[in-house]
Amino acid sequence: MANVVNREFDIRGVNHLALVCKDMARTVEFYRDVLGMPLIKTIDLPGGMGQHFFFDIGNGDSLAFFWFPHSPAAVPGISAPAELPGGGDIASAHGSMNHIAFNISPENFDAYVEKLRSKGVKLGPVLNHDNSPNQVSAVVTDDVFVRSVYFWDPDGVMLEFASWTHQGFKDSDVAHEAVDADGKKSRNVVLKAPSPVPAE
C-alpha cells in the first residue's frame, strides 16, 4: 500500500488507552510484575474519586487504568468478550473495547508465549492469521500476516501479544466491503472510496 499521511492532524500514534479496574494493587502486580511494564505515573483523584495509574507500553505509548470506588461489575459478553479467540464467542457490545494488542517482534514471539505460560498466565491457542477461508494456519506460511496469542488480565480485559510477520501492506490487502448495521454490504464505502493522498 502506498505510504500515506494524515494531512488534517499530526497524529503520532496512541498516547494512552484508559481502562477501569476493580483492584489497582492487583492490576499493578499483573502489568508491572507479570508483564514487566514500568509504572510511570500514579494519581489519587481529588475528593476520594479514585485513582488513575499509567504503565509504559513502549514507543512513548501508555496503558492507563482508573479505579473508581463504585464502578459496576464487568459483564463478560457485553462489556468485553466472553471467550478468547480460538475458544468461542469473541463478540462484545457496541462501543466496548474488545481487546488490546501489544506489538512484539517476530523473533521473540514463541519465547514470549512460553514466558507467559511459565508465569502462570492462561493462554488461548497461538493463532497464525492468514488469508485462507478459515483465516488461521496451523503453521507459519508466507500467507500468514500476523501471529497472535490471547489472554486475560485480572479484570477480564482481553490482551494479545501480536507480531506482524511481514513489513507493510499491499493495496490488495484492502479487499472487503464494510457492512452496515444490518450486516449488508450495500454502501460501497471501502472499495469505491477514493485512495488516500500519498505522502510527498
At which residue positions do the language-model features occur?
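A detector for short, charged/polar N-terminal pre-domain segments
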Residues: 1-9
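Vicinal oxygen chelate
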Residues: 12, 24-25, 82-158, 166-170, ...
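Core segments of cupin and vicinal oxygen chelate
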Residues: 20-72
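Short hydrophobic beta-strand motif reused across regulatory alpha/beta modules
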Residues: 63, 159-162
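A short, polar/proline- and glycine-enriched secondary-structure boundary/capping micro-motif
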Residues: 74-79, 170-173
